Amino acid sequence: MTSLYAPGAEDIRQRLRPFGFFFEKSLKDLIKGIRSHNETPEKLDQFFKQVLSECREEVNSPDLNSKTNAVLKLTYLEMYGFDMAWCNFHILEVMSSNKLQQKRVGYLAASQSFYKDSDILMLATNLLKKDLKYDGNNDVVKVGIALSGLSTIITPSLARDIADDLFTMLNSTRPYIRKKAITALFKVFLQYPEALRDNFDKFVSKLDDDDISVVSAAVSVICELSKKNPQPFIQLSPLLYEILVTIDNNWIIIRLLKLFTNLSQVEPKLRAKLLPKILELMESTVATSVIYESVNCIVKGNMLEEDDFETAMACLERLHTFCDSQDPNLRYISCILFYKIGKINTDFISRFDQLIIRLLSDVDVSIRSKAIELVEGIVDEDNLKAIVQTLMKQFVDEDVVILQTGSIVYEKSKRIPIIIPENYKIKMVNVIISICSADNYSSVNDFEWYNAVIMDLAMLCQDISDKSLGSKIGEQFRNLMIKVPSMREVTIANIIKLISNDNINKQLPTVLRECIWCLGEFSTLVENGNDLIKIMTENISYYSHSVQEVLILALVKVFSNWCNNFQEDKRFEIKMVLKELIEFFENLSYSSTFEVQERSVEVLEFLRLSLEALEEDTEGLPMLLSEVLPSFFNAYELAPIARGTQLKLAVDENLDLETPFLTKEAADELLDEQKSDAISDLMSDISMDEQVELKFVDDSDTSYEEKEKLDDFENPFEIEREKERMSNPYYLGEEDEERTKNSKDLLDLNEEESSDKKPETIRLNRTDNSLNSLSLSTTEISRKKKKGKKKNRVQVLSDEPVIEAAPKRKDAFQKPHDNHSTQNPLKKDKINLRMHSQLENFDFSNFGQSSNAGRGSQEEGNLRKEDELELSRLEANLIVKDEKDNLSDTEEVIVIKKKKKGKKSKSKNKLKTKAKNSPEPNEFLRDQSTDI
């Protein structure tokens, strides 16, 4: 028989807990369970549901140990994405525990959950105030736990309520509490800057603390605050400088150097005082971190001027030593400082060319990527080829790292290949083009070599995904053709090789636009233009619409220069090429791109006229091909013009492009006149034709067949038309059916077979008449150099000068541009790790104001607003009264005045005094009413 007073299962658990017997799953059991159920997502999800159900039951338990265990497990589960905001009140209960271990768990959970719920922080404020008071009940560790937890859940309202308690803790006798309070104040200042303004002296006094850890915490907090707003800390420069001179703690010295870096950016006067001390510190210390921060302070703090070579050499010599270090991190950050010094003045780093070239072959690709940014500062005529050769080898050769393993006696080596990422290859191509073309190719003394480099880059860029490199390579070919006249034959030979390469057409089509433009613009250099035309038209399937736009005019230019190099035996070839071009442009005239379609139709009509004239003219070339066609393109030779020149041209401010020349009525009237003139001309032509028939044809004397056989030359109108046809080359004469049919037919079979043969050789017109055919498949440009003989420098044309116009309007030709390079707005789907702060734009103009004074000023502002509202009400009443007086006697106006709520006597007295001291209210209200 069971007793009524037998203990239950819960009572037994409670009795066994003091002896170490726990029946709930601990955090360790939870982790083991997750690992054991991690086979499939379904099993893991089922396990999580079971654990969450158990935690919900445990967290509602009256036993604080069980509640703490559940909160700890929920804190761990939050990392898997399970929200724990529903148990915030239970977390608050655990935080209020007097046991140290339970309080730690509570503050840990609060740091992960309370920031989502601002209401729970109102309940936690009193608990935080209680835990922050150091007395006999609270030991040092509990206060430290509260300070650490406070910094993670701080909000503006909580910071305002807790700031005074934290400043009180700065006077604690325990250095540990003072240090923790200073670090907690950092988050308070970010959310509530008024606390720093009102208690600035109390906070700064900790820089003179007896304990070095407290001073270190104060310097660190000031350093971090100066990143947000350095202005209020400039007045501390003498005190901070004194600490820098006297202290021997390297950590504090580093923090002070970082702090002076931020301050000197807004206060240039600090340079004269700080620079000698920092240079002295660099010479006296052996600590690598201090030396690096000293150089960083000089560079980032704007202390290094463009003409200060002595300071620059002192910094660069130290960085040179770091670059020889075995530590890759030290080499990397040294390259960063090298680059920043080079941006100030490139002459500073010009003497370190050998070091930078060596860094270009570093085993760490990230160091290579930083070293390649330094190349532009060291390049000259002497080392350009060495730099380009070093970079080009990295495209082809596979670098390896030899890793030594094993003991000294039996030493083994392992070869690890260095994988070059694609972004580094893209960077190399851009740098090679940039350093070679800089300052109008001033560093290039061998343009045959540079032609070969550009050709190799075009071949290497086929496997790179960034196809914009092809456009840059094409621009280099174009610049060489325009700016280096003596190398045009070599350059155009390389261009012909490129467009004849099917791999280039398929994998790097972006290089074709500029290359095809060069072939058209400088087609006088090509002797057999008919073969070049066949090459260009055969690859039409690879050309994009932008390339087709350039191709149309390029083909016409090549044809014009080739056919005008006229020989008697070329007449048939000219006719065949002309037919091929007409057929080619007929296909392009149906393009989906309007620009291609328009250009094709324009050229097609002209070539059809030229073909008609060529068939009619049996002696030589017709005037359309010999004079008219070359005049389209040979008026003048193009000169090099710098990019952006168009924006410098003068813009007429009086130019109106909006107002039409004719009004709508005038335009309609003009159109009506044109229609009437056209109708009258048509009627006159019809009447004249009837008169001619009556005059020259007699039905009684002539039969129908004889009428048809009348000689046209007896008709005076036909004679006039024939004269006009002979004198006007643009006259569209009638064609018989056979001629029209032949002009629209394709080429004969034999001609097609001959045209399908790909030309093997493109011959160039050389000035010395010593022409050697260039085989596209086998021949290469010879680059023989005589030893011991310096090659004469070729002439490079400079850009044409442009007279700069007066300052234009800001909105004139202003292109839309993106600001994402400077300001990258955070996407909504990304985690924002940036700490929210109100310190950046806070005004620290009034230092030392107490919080009471701030509240008083706030009350005065409220009273001032109430006075303004009262005056506005009086003004409205007077306006209504004036309107009522102006109304007639028959009209009735009812004004309902609401009863005003009772105000403080202080506000009433203030209103009376203000009314006494102010000018007459009637005049003020009268002025206000007139404004209204």
From Swiss-Prot:
The modification Phosphoserine is found at residues 700, 727, 770, 773, 798, 888, 918. It is a peripheral membrane protein. One of its GO terms (biological process) is intracellular protein transport. Residues 858-878 form a coiled coil. Belongs to the adaptor complexes large subunit family. Part of the AP-3 complex, an adaptor-related complex which is not clathrin-associated. The complex is associated with the Golgi region as well as more peripheral structures. It facilitates the budding of vesicles from the Golgi membrane and may be directly involved in trafficking to the vacuole. Required for the transport via the ALP pathway, which directs the transport of the cargo proteins PHO8 and VAM3 to the vacuole. This is AP-3 complex subunit delta. The gene is APL5.
